[in-house]
């Protein structure tokens, strides 16, 4: 049910709960790529729940990119995909948190798919 009187933060939290519920229900054995965006940067890290550690990460800050726009999000996506493919990991689960799958998040995901990841 859509609630009209919710502010932006409450809607983001509801989206995040939905995404987490789907991840836990469907893909328990795959590593999870968690994407976080701020106003000026974007970052992605891959978490392996079986080993309980982060196995790869990439961000617009670590790559010395000026901002986190769509083009730079695509660069981050290809970078983390190449790191995972070197570790022979090609299937992951994508967690976009409470952010909409749109814009920078979608650009990062599409670039990771083009580089060879499956999710």
Curated annotation (Swiss-Prot):
Look up keyword rRNA-binding and say if it applies: yes
Q: Which GO terms describe its cellular component?
A: cytosolic large ribosomal subunit
Checking Pfam families in the record gives: Ribosomal_L18p
Provide the GO MF annotations for this entry.
Answer: 5S rRNA binding; structural constituent of ribosome
Q: Name one GO biological process term.
A: translation
InterPro entries documented for this protein: Ribosomal_uL18_bac-type, Ribosomal_uL18_bac/euk
- What are the alphabetically sorted keywords of the record? Ribonucleoprotein, Ribosomal protein, RNA-binding, rRNA-binding
Explain the purpose of this protein: This is one of the proteins that bind and probably mediate the attachment of the 5S RNA into the large ribosomal subunit, where it forms part of the central protuberance.
NCBIfam families for the chain? L18_bact
Q: What is the similarity comment for this entry? A: Belongs to the universal ribosomal protein uL18 family.
Q: What do we know about how this protein assembles, alone or with others?
A: Part of the 50S ribosomal subunit; part of the 5S rRNA/L5/L18/L25 subcomplex. Contacts the 5S and 23S rRNAs.
This protein is called what?
Large ribosomal subunit protein uL18
């Amino acid at each position: 049910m859509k609630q009209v009187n919710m502010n932006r933060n409450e809607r983001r939290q509801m989206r995040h709960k939905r995404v987490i519920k789907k991840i836990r229900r469907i893909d328990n054995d795959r590593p999870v790529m968690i994407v976080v965006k701020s106003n000026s940067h974007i970052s992605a890290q891959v978490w392996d729940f079986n080993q309980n550690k982060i196995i790869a990460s990439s961000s617009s800050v670590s790559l010395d990119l000026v901002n986190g726009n769509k083009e730079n999000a695509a660069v981050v996506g290809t970078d983390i995909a190449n790191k995972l493919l070197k570790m022979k990991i090609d299937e992951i689960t994508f967690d976009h948190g409470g952010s909409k799958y749109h814009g920078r998040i979608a650009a990062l995901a599409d670039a990771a798919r083009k580089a060879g990841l499956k999710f």
